[in-house]
Amino acid sequence: MREALLKSRFPSPHFSAMAEYKNYITPEGYATLKAEFDQLYRTERPKVVSDVAWAASNGDRSENADYIYGKRRLRQIDSRLRFLMKRMDAAVVVDPKDQQGLEKVFFGAWVTLYLITKDEEHTYRIVGQDELDPSKGYISWISPLARALMGKRPGDSLRVETPGGEEEYEVLEVDYRSPEAS
């Protein structure tokens, strides 16, 4: 009931995508979330709390820009900490090393594709929603392309509906190497 109420009030595609699917994540992605959480909690938040306390000691808070900004920044940090905590609590860490030697596409795979319709070759890594980074070739496992790739092997063809129209791909290579090796 709570989820239905939230969906009716906030029909965002981001909310529904995050609520409907498990939060699969690679060990590297989880470490990145944890590092951000630790940096905010152990370093940035205490500094802002100290700044707010100093600003509050200066007297009138109604026109105290340091105090007003500090309180706003503290709310932003606390909001981000809550978000990170929820994402880490819901995380299902999947180590791609456990899938070494598999020729099928699953979570964590590096997939080299030949885009038949444009005569181009692309390499993508299928990762969790919190790891999405198109500049590195990281695509979310719930994206249309990644979902169409699941279970495919080298030599398989697939068609994917994209905002620019239908694209046809051929799987050239599937690999489960670590990101450092790429």
Residue map of PLM features:
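Short, Lys/Arg-enriched N-terminal segments with co-localized hydrophobic residues
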Residues: 3-17
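Extreme N-terminus of proteins, especially the signal/transit-peptide cleavage junction
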Residues: 16-20, 102
